[in-house]
Amino acid sequence: MSHGPLRVGIGGPVGAGKTTLTEKLCAALAHRCSMAVITNDIYTREDAEALMRAQVLPAERIRGVETGGCPHTAIREDASINLAAVADLRRAFPDLDLILIESGGDNLAATFSPELADLTLYVIDTAAGQDIPRKRGPGLARSDLLVVNKTDLAPHVGVDLRLLEEDTKTARGRRPYVMAQLRRGAGVAEIVAFLEREGGLQLLPQE
């Protein structure tokens, strides 16, 4: 893209699976494009360190940002700390095709500044309850792609998966969503295809 690498924001509540999604996308894409990751944590760099431990990307391609206070501010109202990390990565790796920007855990109102992210993925957790899609919120309703994670847990937490998907369709309108089990890799291929289709991400053929 003319302004540099595709920048993809990954948001969602604490524990929904944002870091798992980031890890799975790195595993699927690192050998097919030049990519990097920025993680946002309030007071630590735990998510960045978790990705380094998983060895899905070289450590120098991962930046951990400590947002302090409200993590929502660092991706929306004042994204300067994240924009500085983007600029730093672009200087270090001029050939970058993709930067994933993982937000700190936040509520259903979290959204990314258009200045920071070209596309937004929003992750929700099936185990959080049957009524999550009905609560809407900008992240859930208006993100470019909604990822309904941990669908395998539905029978264990009293969630009717068919009804959950119906409510998700209603909340999303024409916007796409994926029913996923990210730890098992289910749904990752659909998310990659979305990034290619909607983000214009150019990938090398799979080996």
Curated annotation (Swiss-Prot):
Fetch the PANTHER family from UniProt: UREASE ACCESSORY PROTEIN G
Pfam families, sorted: cobW
> Coiled-coil stretches, from where to where?
none
- Where is it found, in Gene Ontology cellular component terms? cytoplasm
The residues listed in the UniProt record as binding GTP, with positions renumbered to this chain, are: G12, P13, V14, G15, A16, G17, K18, T19
Statement: the UniProt record of this protein carries the keyword Nucleotide-binding: yes
Originating organism: Cereibacter sphaeroides (strain ATCC 17025 / ATH 2.4.3)
Entry's localization field: Cytoplasm
The UniProt family comment states:
Belongs to the SIMIBI class G3E GTPase family. UreG subfamily.
Q: How does it assemble?
A: Homodimer. UreD, UreF and UreG form a complex that acts as a GTP-hydrolysis-dependent molecular chaperone, activating the urease apoprotein by helping to assemble the nickel containing metallocenter of UreC. The UreE protein probably delivers the nickel.
The protein's name in its UniProt record: Urease accessory protein UreG
